[in-house]
Regions:
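Short, flexible helix-loop junctions that flank or precede catalytic/ligand sites
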Residues: 1-172
Length: 172
């Protein structure tokens, strides 16, 4: 079931979420957590066993934790209710009809961790892609699974940088 939000009749994200949760659904998708009231309801619902999915405007997966904390959600509630956060970017795809190999300088290969056999392409432009070299988009995802250490870091109010450093080192 999908419920439209209509502020003219006082049907906000928060009031719609309350109504949905009274029906004890297996999964709830909240279009976007925009305010403290909706965040609080979603977090408390997840603590009672509801599976809640939602979106937030952040730059990366760790930013979701900070965003919810900035909305007033207590760190112990975040660490108890969050299982995973993710972020996505849509990147342009190189046109398959006009792609051609491109040389990558050795210093850049090393910096990017590219194997010497890895072929890097660029699109030269053709009729199929409107001479842009690109055709379509592809999602690039960043996923943060919250293990016990990350949850402990949240409770201790660790910075985004500290959580990111831990995740890069331990959660690959």
């Amino acid at each position: 079931t999908q419920i439209p939000i209509n502020h003219e009749i006082n049907m906000t994200f928060a009031s719609a979420l309350r109504a949905v949760l009274r029906q004890s659904p297996d999964v709830v998708m909240v279009g976007e957590i925009r305010d403290a009231e909706t965040a609080e309801i979603a977090i408390k619902a997840s603590l009672t066993g509801q599976f809640i999915l939602s979106t937030l405007h952040t730059n990366d997966s760790i930013g979701a934790i900070t965003r919810l904390a900035d909305m007033g959600v207590e760190p112990f509630l975040l660490s108890s209710s969050l299982v995973m956060t993710s972020a996505q970017r849509l990147c342009r795809r190189i046109c398959p009809k006009c792609r051609e190999p491109q040389e990558v300088p050795e210093h850049l290969r090393q910096k990017l961790g590219l194997d010497p056999d890895t072929v890097v392409y660029h699109g030269r432009g053709c009729e199929a892609c409107g001479n842009s070299g690109y055709k379509g988009r592809e999602a690039v995802l960043e996923v943060l699974l919250l293990d016990d250490e990350v949850k402990d870091m949240i409770v201790k109010r660790a910075s985004e940088g500290q959580i990111a450093a831990y995740a890069r080192k331990n959660l690959q």
